[in-house]
Amino acid sequence: LWSG
């Protein structure tokens, strides 16, 4: 999971 990537967040940014």
From Swiss-Prot:
Question: What is the tissue localization of expression for this protein?
Answer: Expressed by the venom gland.
Instruction: Quote the cellular component terms of the Gene Ontology held in the record.
Output: extracellular region
Source taxon at top rank: Eukaryota
List the subcellular locations: Secreted
Enumerate the GO terms in the molecular function aspect: calcium channel regulator activity; toxin activity
The residue stretches assigned to a coiled coil in this entry are none
Which coarse location class describes where this protein primarily resides? Answer: secreted
This protein's UniProt keywords = Calcium channel impairing toxin, Ion channel impairing toxin, Secreted, Toxin
Record flagged with keyword Secreted: yes
State the protein's purpose: Specific inhibitor of store-operated non-voltage-gated calcium channels.
Write the protein's name.
Tetrapandin-1
- What is the organism of origin for this protein? Pandinus imperator
